[in-house]
Swiss-Prot record:
Keyword Ribosomal protein included in the entry's annotation: yes
Pfam families associated with the record: Ribosomal_L17
InterPro entries from the UniProt entry: Ribosomal_bL17, Ribosomal_bL17_CS, Ribosomal_bL17_sf
Name of the protein in question: Large ribosomal subunit protein bL17
Biological process annotations from GO: translation
Cross-referenced Gene3D superfamilies: Ribosomal protein L17
Keyword Ribonucleoprotein: yes
Keywords assigned: Ribonucleoprotein, Ribosomal protein
SUPFAM superfamilies: Prokaryotic ribosomal protein L17
Gene symbol of the encoding locus: rplQ
Protein family according to the UniProt entry: Belongs to the bacterial ribosomal protein bL17 family.
Amino acid sequence: MRHRKSGRQLNRNSSHRQAMFRNMAGSLVRHEIIKTTLPKAKELRRVVEPLITLAKTDNVANRRLAFARTRDNEIVAKLFNELGPRFASRAGGYTRILKCGFRAGDNAPMAYIELVDRAASQAEVVAAE
């Protein structure tokens, strides 16, 4: 019986799944939008949203926790210097999933996962230039 077992297996063992979501979380933080399959996007939400919540309070302990979960100093810096302050007034719901059809090879449902204030932040960068 699978009672109280949360999360998707995605046909991977636990270490592969952990490494995949660590890499995907880093890519999402770095690029602020990525394209992946719909089940992976839904599962990635459960990894990224707590990281952004952690980044809203900048202290050494939280930075170390974020590094333990991402293993990338560049990602930790962006989380705490950009994303934490950007989402300071938002109480959760930092990501958006947009369905975008089906993959050609295997007809897998595809989706974009993005950070919700991405368009506004990109517009500010263009205006600053």
